[in-house]
Amino acid sequence: MPELVFFSGTMDCGKSTLALQIGHNRSARGLQGVIFTRDDRAGEGKLSSRLGLVTEAVEAAPGMDLHAYLVDQMSKGGKVDYLIVDEAQFLAPEQIDQLARVVDDLDLDVFAFGITTDFRTKLFPGSQRLIELADRIETLQVEAMCWCGARATHNARTVGGEMVVEGEQVVVGDVNRPAAEVGYEVLCRRHHRRRMTSASAYAAAISPDVLPVTSA
């Protein structure tokens, strides 16, 4: 039976790499798929991983009807055996509903990959709808690590190396951006709550100890 499967995890846990691997394995068996993505770090219409792998994809723009797009492709003779959706957290809830229709009405497997929560620990609307509708939810087994060595469970947005907790939910950035730019870092819950990034921890580590002042 076709399924809607949601592969979730923090940044840096290999979601896009797994998406590319699933596509490779299926294409090696003669199957043809459609890849959707939104706001990939490599640019519009690209699916990329941090390992340097990149492939062409269809940009799932806001307001785009994903189900209608596939019906149109298939009615023109296009062969579609499965669907891969990367950065699924950025999709609107109604687009997730369309993915469920693809599974139920077109009998296609849909593999969606995304981050569950944003930098404020709030669910992305797309991820929330996937949790509500998916036949299966898989947590990625490659664990991202906080700077302290603990398992990273939270995504932090940084500006100049400092963690911020206000702003637009979606700002495209990366974990490898220069410190002065908007970037992201994965943290354990403890250090996310304390707003302690690797940069702030390093600054604290090299700060000279303040000696107590005593009166003569």
Swiss-Prot record:
Supply the PANTHER family for this chain.
THYMIDINE KINASE, THYMIDINE KINASE, CYTOSOLIC
Which family does the entry's similarity section mention?
Answer: Belongs to the thymidine kinase family.
- Which residues does the annotation say bind ATP? 9-16, 86-89
* Subunit details: Homotetramer.
Full protein name:
Thymidine kinase
Per the record, the GO terms for biological process are: DNA biosynthetic process; thymidine metabolic process
One GO MF annotation is:
ATP binding
> What Gene3D superfamilies does its record include?
3.30.60.20, P-loop containing nucleotide triphosphate hydrolases
Q: Where is the active site?
A: 87
What species is this protein from? Streptomyces avermitilis (strain ATCC 31267 / DSM 46492 / JCM 5070 / NBRC 14893 / NCIMB 12804 / NRRL 8165 / MA-4680)
* Catalytic activity entry: thymidine + ATP = dTMP + ADP + H(+)
Provide the E.C. number(s) assigned to this enzyme. Answer: 2.7.1.21
Q: Which Pfam families match?
A: TK
Q: Which SUPFAM superfamilies match?
A: Glucocorticoid receptor-like (DNA-binding domain) (SSF57716), P-loop containing nucleoside triphosphate hydrolases (SSF52540)
Main enzyme class: transferase
Q: Which domain of life is it from?
A: Bacteria
Q: Which UniProt keyword terms apply here? A: ATP-binding, Cytoplasm, DNA synthesis, Kinase, Nucleotide-binding, Transferase
Q: Give the UniProt subcellular location, in the record's own words.
A: Cytoplasm
Any Gene Ontology CC annotation: cytosol
